C-alpha cells in the first residue's frame, strides 16, 4: 500500500492526469479492498491528478451504497473523480459474495441505472429492479433533510468508465451507447 501511495503522489508531481486503482477482496497480489478509501488517503496529498476506480465491482454492492460513497468521494476530491465500474474481476470475489453463477453483467447495468436515477432524482425514492430495490418514502422529511441522498460534486455526475475485456464485448458496446469511456 505504501508503494502504491508513493507512486500516485509521484505521478501527480510529474503532471500525470489520472491514477486508476482497482478493487479485489480476495487476493494478496493486489490488497486494495476499497479503491475509494485508498484514494481518499491521497486527496490532500496530491494537487491535480484525477482518481479513477478501476473498477468498482457493482454486483458486490447495493447501488444506493455506491451512489452515496461515490458522491461523497466526488465532493472530497472536489470533482477529481472518474467512476470506473464493471461486473467484477476475480472468481474468488464472486464466490465470496455468492454471485458466481449470477448474471453479473445485467446486475452491473441495473446497478448503474439505479445509481444514476438516485443522483438525478429527488426523494421520495422508489426504484425497483430485478436484483435490488430502493425505497425511501415513509421517512422522507425534507425540512429535516431525512431521506435525501447526496448528489455528486460534478454535474450531472462524475465521468463514468466501464471495464471491457475485448473490442467486441457487450460492455464496450454499452460504453459506446451511453458515451462512457471504456477501460
Predicted regions and their residues:
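C-terminal amphipathic alpha-helical "assembly" element
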Residues: 1-16, 82-84, 102, 116, ...
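N-terminal beta1-alpha1-beta2 module of alpha/beta enzyme domains
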Residues: 1-53, 157-158
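Structural preference for beta-strand elements that scaffold enzyme active sites
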Residues: 18, 48-55, 80-84, 159-161, ...
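Short amphipathic alpha-helical segments at helix-loop
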Residues: 23, 54, 96-100
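Histidine-centered beta-alpha loop that forms part of the nucleotide-sugar donor binding/catalytic region
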Residues: 24, 54-56, 86-88
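Glycine-rich "substrate-gating" loop/helix at the edge of Rossmann-like oxidoreductase active sites
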Residues: 27-32, 56-62, 100-101
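Residue-level detector of alpha-helical hydrophobic segments embedded in or interacting with membranes
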Residues: 30, 54, 58, 147, ...
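Internal, glycine-rich beta/alpha segment that forms the wall or movable "lid"
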Residues: 62-178
